[in-house]
Amino acid sequence: MKLTNFKRSVFIAMLVVLFGTFSNAVSAQSNKKQKYKVAVCDWMILKRQKLGAFGLASEIKADGIELDMGGLGKRPTFDSKLGDPIERQKFLDKSKETGVGISSIAMSGFYAQSFAKRDSINLMINDCVATMKNMKVKVAYLPLGTESDLTKNPELRPIIIERLKWAGKQVGKIGGVIAIETSLNATEEKKLLEEIGCKHIKSSFNFANAVDNGRDIATELKILGKKYLAQIHASTTDTVWLENDKNVDMPKIKKTLDEMNWKGWLIVERSRDVTQVHNVKANYGANVAYLKKIFQN
């Protein structure tokens, strides 16, 4: 009798494992067919370059994560595990296991560090491009941040253009794209991209930039155009969840992107409810669910 119960338990355990694997495979296959996919920033869900980011993203039903290169500070390059083949493989295995993809490789260190003034920019970009190549990720996210804000520091424009032209050549070698986030409006950002003149440098459009400056998101997207749009940070400065944000007309945004025939990743960075700003699962779960409701229905 005990042996029979043991066999039954083993059989049930095997079924659970097989069902989990099958579910992840079905989920991954379904994600591949979606025109719009929804990701979360690993550093914003407090899992910067941690394997747990995949599990948490899966739990809140995100299709992927934007995987950060790690801290920068005054280091010559990013504090990244991803240059180590053994560590890198762990991330690739976890992505496959959970069915959670990698939307892009982020260089979030440039939020605070100056892309225009740092000496070792070549090493940083090359490390990121190598990571993209080794992880088969086609997009890198580069925020120009406070230190290279072209609205406040227009004198930095020539050096930023020069460096982005060089960076475009490097990422072009692997057929990838560096998606830059600037403080410029869509008209000025398009002019910047035209001046750079490299198909491997595009825009990472941020809802927050438009909303914080009183601009209509859909109009800005139309101006920027499909050609220059690599990915979208589909969230605003922390106040309320996206579904409660009166400044974000999500059905209108989807209609605009449909008309542009654009497809790609919508990435949740913020839009946290300030009354529960530290509740990661509630904030990111709600925003992911709302984006999927609008864009994947």
Predicted features and spans:
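Active-site-proximal loop/turn and secondary-structure-junction residues that shape catalytic pockets
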Residues: 44, 69-71, 108-111, 144-148, ...
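Glycine-rich, proline-tolerant flexible connector loops at the mouths of alpha/beta enzymes
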Residues: 68-92, 144-151
